[in-house]
């Protein structure tokens, strides 16, 4: 990493970087890594093998700010959340602009056996592309707990695209914390991102899942992914759209995990802060996904390492966790636009759950649908979904498409998804152009018959699903 900030447009290609004593890299401190642009713009890190970092492999993270560095550790008179809000605003003072920071490309790297994260970064990774990386065996030694551990852990992943990555055997797969605005996770293969059953949870550690989106306002787009771990998405957030995914794990932490925290949202496709708000939950969309109860449906219990406590988490797959959330019609009916606004009367509405949309989803093997699901498909037939590996290639062994037969959904696009509530930003490309979900997991074209899940054709199930091109 450069010793100073602002050293931009560097290419790091074809290196082997291993065994470095990097330091713990939380979001409100200087974020160290074995490789990183150190608060600059336009780096390319490609075709590298990055391994055995004591903490982070690649850091796209925060610069050193002496007045805010490790504030809570050293002073703790402000809450950790407040110091992070301070860090966002101070970052704008210190040049956190699209023209100066971010827009990196991280591609085709083999990142493994790092103990905090494969790729981490607070604010410095905005507008970046993270693609075709093989990220695996992160935090397997379990020497470190704390809320910063994942294959990819990004704060403020504004307009960041993470696509075609193969992430497995990590304590957590991808963690988008705060300001996952314009973030898109697409065509990724995630599996085995869970601790062994005997492993206890370290002090400060988190539960395991393929994806965690935390205290954001959206729009966060998760499409055409294969999610095979026992927990697919930890949902302590709002403004998420899940489209054309194969989801074999539970949606956890729905309506929970945010407390009173209020976090920033931004001008569309910019870093400038537009506002702050608590997480109301909801404002979520589910279209053309396949939900499979692959794992046991009983709540999962994780014992603590540092005390006699434990954590319990849902493992029942499906959208049923949103049963208490309103449809759009139910939500909008609370506002009478023919009368003058009554601030006091609307107070409870303004702080209640936002609406949810769910259509064209498939629920198999006991997975349960939201009570307002439209055009859904539910089957009690026995379903198998197994991932097998041979010579570096990965294949799905499944009978899903035999059960689906002729069922189909409609073509989904930006117009269908609409805008995320707080930032009033469409689910769209970083350049503001609309998205039509007519391209599948393999890059193939979806035709007039739209099959739920990540594949355009049922015959695609026999293809190698490891489309990551890392060596």
Task: Name the predicted role of every residue range.
Residues 409-448:
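Active-site and glycan-interaction determinants of carbohydrate-active enzymes
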Residues 22-38, 54-410, 415:
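Glycine- and acidic/polar-rich repeat regions and solenoidal domains
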Residues 1-11, 27-40:
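Extracellular beta-strand-rich solenoid/capping regions of secreted or surface-exposed proteins
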Residues 40-48:
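Transmembrane beta-barrel wall of Gram-negative outer-membrane proteins
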Residues 11-26:
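Active-site-adjacent substrate/metal-binding segments within catalytic domains
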Residues 448-471:
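Short, surface-exposed, low-complexity cationic segments
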């Amino acid at each position: 990493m450069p010793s100073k900030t602002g050293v931009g447009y560097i290419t790091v290609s074809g290196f082997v970087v291993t065994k470095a004593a990097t330091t713990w890299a939380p979001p409100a401190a200087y974020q160290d890594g074995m490789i990183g642009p150190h608060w600059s713009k336009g780096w390319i890190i490609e075709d590298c093998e990055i391994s055995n970092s004591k903490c982070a492999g690649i850091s796209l993270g925060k610069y050193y700010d002496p007045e805010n560095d490790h504030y809570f550790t050293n002073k703790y008179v402000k809450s950790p959340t407040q110091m992070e809000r301070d860090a966002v605003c101070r970052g704008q003072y210190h040049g956190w602009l699209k023209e100066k920071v971010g827009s990196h490309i991280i591609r085709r790297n083999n990142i493994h056996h790092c103990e905090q994260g494969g790729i981490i970064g607070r604010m410095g990774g905005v507008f970046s592309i993270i693609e075709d990386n093989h990220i695996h065996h992160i935090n397997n030694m379990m020497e470190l707990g704390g809320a910063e551990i994942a294959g990819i852990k990004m704060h403020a992943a504004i307009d960041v695209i993470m696509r075609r990555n193969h992430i497995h055997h990590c304590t957590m797969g991808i963690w988008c914390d705060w300001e996952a605005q314009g973030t898109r996770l697409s065509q990724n293969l995630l599996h085995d991102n869970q601790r062994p059953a005997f492993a206890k949870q370290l002090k400060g550690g988190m539960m395991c899942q393929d994806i965690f989106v935390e205290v954001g306002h959206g729009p966060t787009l998760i499409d055409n992914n294969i999610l095979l771990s026992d927990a697919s998405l930890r949902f302590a957030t709002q403004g998420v759209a899940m489209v054309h995914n194969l989801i074999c794990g539970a949606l956890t932490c729905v309506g929970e995990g945010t407390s009173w925290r209020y976090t920033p949202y931004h001008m569309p496709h910019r870093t400038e802060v537009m506002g702050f708000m608590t997480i109301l939950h909801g404002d979520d969309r589910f279209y053309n996904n396949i939900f499979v109860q692959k794992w046991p449906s009983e709540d999962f219990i994780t014992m603590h390492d540092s005390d006699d406590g434990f954590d319990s988490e849902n493992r029942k797959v499906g959208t049923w966790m949103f049963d208490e959330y309103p449809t759009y019609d139910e939500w909008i009916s609370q506002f009478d636009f023919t009368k003058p606004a009554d601030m006091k009367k609307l107070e409870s509405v303004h702080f209640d759950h936002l609406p949810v949309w769910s259509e064209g989803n498939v629920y198999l093997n006991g997975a349960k649908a939201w009570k307002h699901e439209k055009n859904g498909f539910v089957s009690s037939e026995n379903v198998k979904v197994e991932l097998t590996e041979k010579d570096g290639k990965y294949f799905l062994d499944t009978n899903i498409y035999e059960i689906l037969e002729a069922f189909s959904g409609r073509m989904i696009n930006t117009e269908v998804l609409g805008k995320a509530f707080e930032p009033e930003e469409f689910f769209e490309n970083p350049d503001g152009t609309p998205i039509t979900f007519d391209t599948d997991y393999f890059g193939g074209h979806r035709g007039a018959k739209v099959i739920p899940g990540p594949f355009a054709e049922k015959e695609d199930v026999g293809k190698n699903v490891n489309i990551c091109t890392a060596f």
